[in-house]
Amino acid sequence: MSNEIELLQKQVSELQDLVKKQSLIISKTGERVLELQLDKQKHDVTDFDSKFSKSISKKSGSATQFDATDFATNEDLVELVKELQGELNFIEERSIRRLVNSLKKDDDDVIAPLPNADGDIPAISDGVFPKSLKEFKDIPDLKLVRLAKFYERLPPTLKEQEDFENFLEGKVEAFHINETTDEEISKELEKFSKDELDDAFNDVARYLGLSLRRGTEIW
């Protein structure tokens, strides 16, 4: 028992170190993006000063026309920082929850739901996200596909692509992949082989940080 506890403590320590390294890399990436944005801002200002000086030296009586929208405003930079911070928060939240899920071993252990790419967290109350390790292990195919779609572990169908394009073109006000009906998923399930469903199960398990796998010799 003591050896198992020591092993778990070692795994927790290694995972914590990994999360710290990932957070540092993400933070450095965000700083670099801001540096590039500021460098561009400085370059644009210098370029404008040069054009303005040439215009004055020619004594043309009017300054060269320029488009003020080419320059990033303080509001743009603030918004960029907010977006980057939001992404960092989601990534950190996913890392923490994956760390928690990686330690789940017993059937009754509760699974922590992770945010998807849009930052949405599935509600356990709606019955789609499994409450425990056993529920995930025995998840029905329909719920598995719905969960895989939520986490973008499956490619979109033609209809989903069309719906998303309509959303981008402003033809519909909102687009949510989880609005696919059970009937639509049931029809889609007919095209899946057992191996494809096993792959979907394993992909979702990896995303959630769970050690469960279907099949043999699967990492």
Swiss-Prot record:
Alphabetical list of InterPro entries matching this protein: DUF3294 (IPR012917)
One GO cellular component assignment for this chain's record is: cytoplasm
The protein's organism comes out as Saccharomyces cerevisiae (strain ATCC 204508 / S288c)
Q: What else is known?
A: Present with 1550 molecules/cell in log phase SD medium.
Cross-link Glycyl lysine isopeptide (Lys-Gly) (interchain with G-Cter in SUMO) residue location(s): K137
Q: List the disulfide bonds.
A: none
**Per UniProt, which keywords does this protein have?**
Cytoplasm, Isopeptide bond, Phosphoprotein, Ubl conjugation
Residues modified to Phosphoserine: S23
Organism phylogeny: Eukaryota, Fungi, Dikarya, Ascomycota, Saccharomycotina
Q: What is its main location?
A: cytoplasm
Q: What is this protein called?
A: Uncharacterized protein MRP8
Subcellular location(s) of the protein: Cytoplasm
